[in-house]
């Protein structure tokens, strides 16, 4: 089975929950933790990893707190000899049965870059209210890279939490310092994934992702980031154009036109409404023509129906995750003293130095 790569920073408590989940539900999983935490968190990480040493194979790679995030990931990827890697996070929980399906599929289909299931997002708010939403994933198997990119842009989704070819991940993170922009990164990563190769989606859940009001995240200060950081948005247009030339065989002029259309679509989603919030979306071809996405929504709705196969399959997992999420909020010292969010990695590093 492919190794799970988990970059982590100042969250030993959250990581303990994820590793505990893997130890309980998927013993013998192989995990690499790329730890870039501050010194005061080191002991917590050592204790966390020691707690699962008899059940999981965990390689703990420790980096200086100022060592850049994407460089940590690259260093860890370069230590792996396997063809396929599962990307994870210290607050997200993979469904390994879906990851195993993805691994088997990619081994037989070299023209696909990544494989994934849907994502169930849990968000714990300050009032202790828990919200849940579905993050869909679509099959993008058209032989034309330009078509895959255009279809993706209509109804984009996260492609990070998946099983992916290691060489493709290395390319992703080698250029990540150029492509990272809050509110745009998942979009640009997804376009790169579906331009460089095809995407495989399964109707089953691939990941349970969590957000905790006590944690610190990278996100835009406001929805007008595309105006405040317009130069960076234009840089993304050029990067997408180059991908369409290199992977899609388009001319420079045609690739530029397409990349402008792609970025305009992303901005329209930020400025107005996400596709699934637009009235009548459920009858739009973007949704209706994807049987996989419709199955994912049915599975998601089934989680809330007693006796539904989806609920029976995932109930123990969900109860564990929700319990850990609430426990972290009441007891954790993860990200202690940090802002709720930072717009850039530079701001995050400066904040550390200020302590």
Regions found by a protein language model. Give the residues of each.
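Short, flexible, basic/aromatic active-site loop/helix in glycosyltransferases
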Residues: 134-154
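Short, acidic, metal-binding catalytic loop of nucleotide-sugar glycosyltransferases
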Residues: 20-29
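Active-site donor/metal-binding and catalytic loop motifs
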Residues: 120, 126-128, 160, 196, ...
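Glycine-rich, basic loop-to-helix element that forms the pyrophosphate-binding segment
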Residues: 63-80
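Short beta-strand-to-loop acidic/aromatic patch adjacent to the donor-nucleotide binding site
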Residues: 82-91
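Conserved donor NDP-sugar-binding/catalytic core segment of glycosyltransferases
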Residues: 99-131
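A conserved acidic beta->alpha catalytic loop
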Residues: 34-48
């Amino acid at each position: 089975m492919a190794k799970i790569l988990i970059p982590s920073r100042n969250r030993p408590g959250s990581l303990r929950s994820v590793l505990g989940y893997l130890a309980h539900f998927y013993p013998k999983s192989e995990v690499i933790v790329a730890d870039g935490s501050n010194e005061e968190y080191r002991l917590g990480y050592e204790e966390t990893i020691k707690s699962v040493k008899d059940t999981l194979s965990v390689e703990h790679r420790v980096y200086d707190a100022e060592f850049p995030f994407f460089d940590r990931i690259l260093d860890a990827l370069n230590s792996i000899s396997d063809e396929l890697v599962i990307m994870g996070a210290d607050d997200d929980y993979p469904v390994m049965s879906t990851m195993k399906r993805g691994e088997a599929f990619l081994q037989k289909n070299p023209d696909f870059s990544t494989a994934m299931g849907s994502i169930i997002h849990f968000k714990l708010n300050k009032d202790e209210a828990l919200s849940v939403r579905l993050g869909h994933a679509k099959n993008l198997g058209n032989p034309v890279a330009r078509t895959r990119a255009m279809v993706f842009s209509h109804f984009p989704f996260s492609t990070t939490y998946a099983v992916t070819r290691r060489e493709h991940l290395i390319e992703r993170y080698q250029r990540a310092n150029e492509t990272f922009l809050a509110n745009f990164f998942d979009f640009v990563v997804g376009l790169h994934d579906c331009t460089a190769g095809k995407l495989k989606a399964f109707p089953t859940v691939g990941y349970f992702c969590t957000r905790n009001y006590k944690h610190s995240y990278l996100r835009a200060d406001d929805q007008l980031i595309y105006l405040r950081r317009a130069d960076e948005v234009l840089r993304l247009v050029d990067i997408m154009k180059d991908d369409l030339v290199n992977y899609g065989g388009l001319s420079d002029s045609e690739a530029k036109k397409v990349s402008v259309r792609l970025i305009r679509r992303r901005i329209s989603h930020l400025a107005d409404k996400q596709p699934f919030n637009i009235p009548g979306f459920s009858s739009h071809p973007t949704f209706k023509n994807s049987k996989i996405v419709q199955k994912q929504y049915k599975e998601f709705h089934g989680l809330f129906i007693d006796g539904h196969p989806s609920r029976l399959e995932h109930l123990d997992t969900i109860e564990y995750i929700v319990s850990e999420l609430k426990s972290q909020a009441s007891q954790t010292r993860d990200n202690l003293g940090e802002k709720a969010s930072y717009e850039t990695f530079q701001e995050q590093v400066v904040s550390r130095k200020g302590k």
